[in-house]
Amino acid sequence: MIKYVLISALLVVAVYSFTIEDNEDALLEEAEDELDTEEERRMALPPGAVCNGHKSDCQCFGAKYKCSCPFLWRFRRSAECHCKKGWAWTAIKKRSCHNRYQWSG
């Protein structure tokens, strides 16, 4: 009986330690995201400028502009993404951008 209690207590401690590590990782990721949003707030790229395809469309200036990348751009070294005009749903998607005050009237 005591063995079962000790084993279950060790199991609880192990699970608790893993959840603490996950929480620390989540806090680090949140801090990195906050830094990225601070960058996005500071600058918005003009239409036609080279943008980072791995980031959100918020980096492009204007409600309907998005970061458009060529087909299979990740596998080509010379391929660059550019801020190009998108569809109306791009403006709907960009309503949640932190830097929307720069282009909204």
Swiss-Prot record:
It holds the Pfam family Toxin_34. It is found in: Secreted. Expressed by the venom gland. Disulfide bonds join C51-C67, C58-C97, C60-C83, C69-C81. It comes from the Eukaryota. One of its GO terms (cellular component) is extracellular region. Keywords: Disulfide bond, Ion channel impairing toxin, Neurotoxin, Potassium channel impairing toxin, Secreted, Signal, Toxin, Voltage-gated potassium channel impairing toxin. Residues 18-41 form a propeptide. Residues 1-17 form the signal peptide. GO terms for molecular function: potassium channel regulator activity; toxin activity. Its main location: secreted. Belongs to the neurotoxin 04 (omega-agtx) family. 01 (type I omega-agtx) subfamily. Insecticidal to house crickets. It induces an excitatory slow-onset impact that leads to irreversible spastic paralysis. It also modifies human voltage-gated potassium channel Kv1.5/KCNA5. Most likely, it binds to the voltage-sensing domain of the channel, suggesting it does not block the pore but prevents its opening at physiological membrane potentials. The recombinant peptide binds to the channel in an irreversible manner and slows down the hKv1.5 current activation kinetics. It is not toxic to mice, when intracranially injected (at 0.5 ug/g mouse). This is U2-lycotoxin-Ls1b. It comes from Lycosa singoriensis (Wolf spider). The lineage of its organism: Eukaryota, Metazoa, Ecdysozoa, Arthropoda, Chelicerata.
